[in-house]
Structures are given as structure tokens and as C-alpha cells.
């Protein structure tokens, strides 16, 4: 069985990474929306394993440990700091179990994960030291549990992304580092998206790019510029929602679809985004365009589901286990072309 490293795989073609665990696990009934703490690894590990395997079946080459928001400060917020290490190790063990039982002829890569701490304060040494400690302990656990790569993601402060990369680079593992700017073309500390990515490459990021917050329409223009400038591999993992030039992220995305029962809070985020979901063809088109630009590390973040991950994989020319079950309207009773289908039913399609 082949067991290539991340960079070798990227040098030879696309690598698919399923993210977006928060939303999908919440939809499956195993996580509280808004709070978004991944207790599932302790409380319902089978549910987490099932999602990993569904993503694997759909074509994800990377099994990313679900430790997003599973850091010390978030665990303090919910009063469960004592469960910090057990939660992280449980998530890593589940991911490793899935990664080492691949469906194809090559091992999957298990990824340790660190992300935005929501504790960062610009020009605050105490904040920086605390964030460094948070990242370092999570990286140490990931290495100890056999991670093949490390992913740092969803950073909206450039300096926090630099710190995350520094901590990850203390290991010998390949690093993926992605930023998630809000509605502007710069991060919260005023550094442009392009300059942040250039700096991350210069500091040794093996794969640099963007994830989360923005849908395909408002992420792809930035990815085009990043790909033009960076020499390293580039990552693109948008959310699966129809963000616009007026509303570049999903945080203030309006529902203009005739909703008669809006969410009880001010925004559609995070519990009423469903009407703005991209369809599979939009996601496939994004993946194809990004891949044609030379972006080989691709996936979906919030809003990801196995069907959409399959679309990403197939859009870049891959055949995955789930390809067996892709759409087939040939035998649909009203839209199909099978000779056994009744004409008077098919003729009614425009009135259905």
C-alpha cells in the first residue's frame, strides 16, 4: 500500500480535505450550535467516526482530527477544562483509526488541528503567550497520537497565524496554514490577505491559503491572486454558502428567499443558512476553476457534507468510492429516458 507524504501527493495532483465538522455534526444531532464545542469525541465517538468514514468514502484524502474549538480557553468558557486533554486525544485517536483503514490503495493522512483561539489581542504580550501555550499543547498531543500533518486554520489575525505556524514548525511534520478574513480584504490587524499569505510562505508554511467564512464566489478572486504570487502549494476551502460582494462572509448573510419564520437571533448565521446553501454544481465548478489555477489542496469548510466533498473530488478528475452513487436520472420515473418509463407520466413533468 502506498504511503506518500503530503507534499509528494500535492506535487503529483490534487489532495482533498474535508473540513466543516461543526455544522455537519450539529446537523446530525451531536453538537450544540453557537457554543460549537466538539464534545462528540468523548460523548459520541461512533458518530464522529461515522462522519470521518463518510468523508473518506466521498474522497477526502485527509482525516482531520475534530479539535476545532477544542482548546483550553473554549473549555474554560464552558466549564470543562478538566476534559481538555481527554477530548483532544479522543478526537485524534478516532481520526488515526480511520486514516489507517483507507478504502483505496493508499493510506489517508491524519491531521492534527489548531485554529483561531478567539483570545488574541494585538500588541498584547500576555495574550500572545497564552495563545502560544494553547497551540503548543494541542500540537504536542497531535504529534504524540501519530499525526501525519498539522493544519492551522481559520485565522483572522495575521499575527496569530504566524504564531500558529511557528508552533507547528517546531515539529518535523508538514504544515497547512489557512486564513479566514472577515468582510474586508485584510485581516483584523490590518495586514492584507496577500501579504499575510506571502509572510506565511516565507516563514515556512508548506501549504498556504484560505478557508472558511467565505463562499466560492468571494474566496476564488483572492485565491487567484494568492496562486499568482506564492511558490508553495495553495489551499482553498470555502464554506458552501452563496456569499456575495455585498456580504462576502456568512456572518451577516441575508435570507432573501421568502422566509416566513426567521431565526430568533439577529442573523441567519449559524442556524438559518440553509436557503443560501450552494448546490453541488456550484461547488464542483469552484473546485474545477481552482484546480485549473494550480490550486491542488482543495476541500470545503462549514457546510461541507459527503456529497459536496465527492463533487470536489470528481471535479478535479478523481474517482472515489462514492462515485458509484452519483446522480443517475436515466431511470427516474418522470425525468428519465429508460424505455420502460410511461410516456403519459413523463409528459406531465412541466406541470408536476
Predicted regions mapped to residue ranges:
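Domain-level signal for soluble alpha/beta catalytic cores
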Residues: 1-352
